[in-house]
């Protein structure tokens, strides 16, 4: 989030996008027809994606970041679970709210919801990440009904959605119709974090399939149980290789031995 800029509105976004064109990014795209315009840039052969936005009256990204930091301090398992599940959504093309996926904030809220429920039952014992992952996948993949239920983070509960929508003058459903996924925003009660998640059906199928893969893998020999969530030659392995080449060059190009000392 950029807090200050010298341009106005779309002008500032296009100015920055033009400047970034000179910095070696693989792809740069300005998305303007949203509540908060954003610049999306990718690098590393499309493996690394960054969103850039400008602070303004409608922008709540800084408040969101503060709240997420708070959740991470409260729930030890939130960070690793978010990394794994975010990568799963990246692989399935469901991580981008601008194309009907679930935002990172929305995913974090869902994970925090499950972790809170587990703490209510188990007390302050050390979190079992494997069990927490299974519970998340089972609840949001098989049990949660997005058409009839919403998630409240303020009250930490599932709540029923209205069974009927207001009618227009002709007796039909008035626009806009109900959002595809309801996740209350604890930083802004009037905002639904899941309002743009039109791929919620596919999202829940991904969680359900991941659960089956993890459960089945527990009774098999060899391989990573967690890795069964991801396909062969998958995106996450390409990310691992990119990180190794970027941050662990000695693994790919061993250091030359030091020259022998002169006699």
Q: How should these model regions be labeled?
A:
Residues 113-263:
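Pol beta-like nucleotidyltransferase catalytic core
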Residues 24-27, 35-38, 93-99, 123-124:
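Eukaryotic intrinsically disordered and solvent-exposed regulatory patches
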Residues 4-12, 30, 55, 68-69, ...:
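N-terminal regions immediately upstream of nucleotidyltransferase
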Residues 63-106:
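Basic, alpha-helical interaction scaffolds
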Residues 4-7, 44-47, 57-59, 78, ...:
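Conserved beta-strand elements of beta-rich interaction domains across eukaryotes
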Residues 102-116:
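P-loop NTPase catalytic cores that bind/hydrolyze ATP
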Residues 11, 15, 38, 66, ...:
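Acidic, Ser/Thr-rich intrinsically disordered and amphipathic helical segments
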Residues 13-59:
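Conserved catalytic core of two-metal-ion nucleotidyltransferases
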